[in-house]
Every structure is written in structure tokens, then in C-alpha cells.
Design a protein with these regions (language model features):
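Domain-level signal for Mg2+-assisted phosphodiester chemistry and nucleotide/NA-binding surfaces
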Residues: 1-93, 121, 136, 144
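C-terminal helix of von Willebrand factor
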Residues: 151-175
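Short aromatic-glycine-enriched beta-strand elements
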Residues: 185-194, 204, 251
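Short nucleic-acid-contacting surface segments enriched for D/E, G, S/T with interspersed K/R
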Residues: 213-237
């Protein structure tokens, strides 16, 4: 039995594009690695001062915390602190990074596999320490993910590509993927798309011709700008259709634009 722990930096995930994240799917993602979840911690900020003054705000925040708890996550709440900087401005701060790192290190003795939910590069040393102790560490994040952190983990899951992790805004059937092959001479590419929650649940045969792609900002599509989608690992959103030969292709493709909170 592979014993797993989940450690989610909620503030980072929500702030960087994970608003509306389905916590049940996070658990399913770990279970798809043939692991049994022993620990599931969600680290969140709590602004007690504001909640005391704003009943509406308090109600919404409590409903959100209750929803996370219903998915069997243990909540670790970090109180928001307020202080004045040198210019007299009031600054708010609630950083749960240290709490998450300490808990992960202490609880890792009884775990084989850890899913870290954050794009914060400050967790680089935590990941390396856990790996040096023989643990497999995977990463789940959205936008603004530290490249150093992403390269250090054993497997990286982009939250935008995990099926069902985020709610569909308009119940659209559009897919998301990344370009992994580009033929500049013939102007086509192949996209890789997640088909499930397992590490290898990926199909990489989705054909995309440059003529089926449009930049979201309206600028002309060139070989160079099309190729940059691969080098910059941009997420591409598209409709998937079956060709007459039974293969699949992407049409009405464009850059995916996440909704930031």
C-alpha cells in the first residue's frame, strides 16, 4: 500500500488561477496514483478581524471552509496579521508556508507519496528534503509556478489540464492541452491532452494546423508565434473533432486565458 499525504497551499492555488477548485478531484488525483490517503491538509488564511466586522464576508468564508472540510481535508488556519510599514501604510500578511513545510516534514515519516499543492518556489528545499528521505513528491499548481520547483518534483500536474478539477464556466466541451511537437516547414503541431488522472493518462496525437489557431488578442498567427506556444508551454484551448481517417484534430484553437481571482 502506498501511503499518501496531501498538503495544499490554498492561498497560492486560489490566487494563481485555482478559484473554484474541486477538492474531491484532488483526492481522486492522488488515489489514481494507486495510493491510500492518510493525511490531507489545507492551509488557509483567516481574517478574524474582518470577519467580526463583516457578517457577509464571514458567512462566505465559513461556507468555503465548510465545503473543504466536507471533502475530508484538515484545515490549518493562519491568522491574518496587520502592521504598518515605514511609510505608514497598513500591510496584511498571513503566510502558512512554514506551517505547511513543518507538517510535511513531521508527517512524512509515515508517508510514501506526497502531493504538494502550490506554485511557490520557497518549497523547493522542502521537496528536495522529502525526496532525499525516499519520498515521491508530485506538484499541483496553476499560474505563476516556479520553474525551479516544477523541475524538482517527480511529476507535475497543471491544474488547468487535470480533468474535472476546475468547474466549466459555460459548460463548454472545449479541451485543453499543450504543444509537444511542431513542424515549422508544414505548419502543424501535435498537442498532448490529459485523458485521466493517472501520470500516464495522456494522449499526444491531437493534430493542430496553424490555420486552425487564432491568437486571443487578434494578432496575426505566424510560424514564430505558433512555435512559441511550444517553447513557452502555453496552454491551448480547442474543440476536438474526429477526422475522416479516424484520427483527431483540434479546431478553433486559441491560448487558454485563466480566470484570476
Amino acid at each position: 500500500m502506498i501511503k499518501a499525504g496531501i498538503f495544499l497551499d490554498i492561498e497560492n492555488l486560489v490566487r494563481c488561477g485555482g478559484w473554484g477548485i474541486r477538492y474531491r478531484v484532488v483526492r481522486e488525483l492522488v488515489e489514481a496514483q494507486e495510493a491510500t490517503i492518510l493525511r490531507a491538509n489545507a492551509y488557509m488564511a483567516i481574517d478574524s478581524e474582518r470577519e467580526e466586522k463583516d457578517i457577509d464576508y464571514q458567512r462566505k468564508k465559513q461556507e468555503y471552509r465548510d465545503a473543504v472540510r466536507r471533502e475530508s481535508f484538515h484545515l490549518v488556519l493562519k491568522k491574518v496579521q496587520r502592521y504598518r510599514n515605514s511609510e505608514g501604510d497598513i500591510i496584511t500578511k498571513a503566510n502558512a508556508d512554514l506551517d505547511l513545510a513543518i507538517d510535511a516534514l513531521l508527517q512524512a515519516d509515515n508517508l510514501d507519496y506526497i502531493l504538494l499543492g502550490s506554485g511557490d518556489g520557497d518549497f523547493f528545499r522542502l521537496v528536495r528534503t522529502l525526496q532525499n528521505r525516499g519520498k515521491r513528491v508530485d506538484l499541483l499548481s496553476f499560474s505563476n509556478t516556479s520553474e525551479i520547483l516544477r523541475c524538482e518534483v517527480d511529476n507535475y500536474f497543471s491544474g488547468y489540464l487535470v480533468p474535472g478539477l476546475l468547474p466549466s464556466i459555460d459548460n463548454s466541451s472545449r479541451k485543453r492541452g499543450v504543444m509537444h511537437v511542431f513542424n515549422e516547414e508544414k505548419g502543424f503541431a501535435f498537442l498532448a491532452v490529459r485523458t485521466g488522472l493517472g501520470v500516464l493518462d495522456i494522449r499526444d496525437d491531437v493534430f493542430c494546423h496553424i490555420s486552425d489557431f487564432r491568437h486571443r488578442d487578434g494578432r496575426a498567427v505566424t510560424d514564430q508565434s505558433f512555435a512559441q506556444l511550444k517553447t513557452q508551454q502555453k496552454i491551448i484551448e480547442f474543440e476536438l473533432v474526429e477526422r475522416s481517417d479516424g484520427k483527431v484534430k483540434a479546431i478553433n484553437a486559441t491560448e487558454f486565458e485563466p480566470e484570476m481571482k
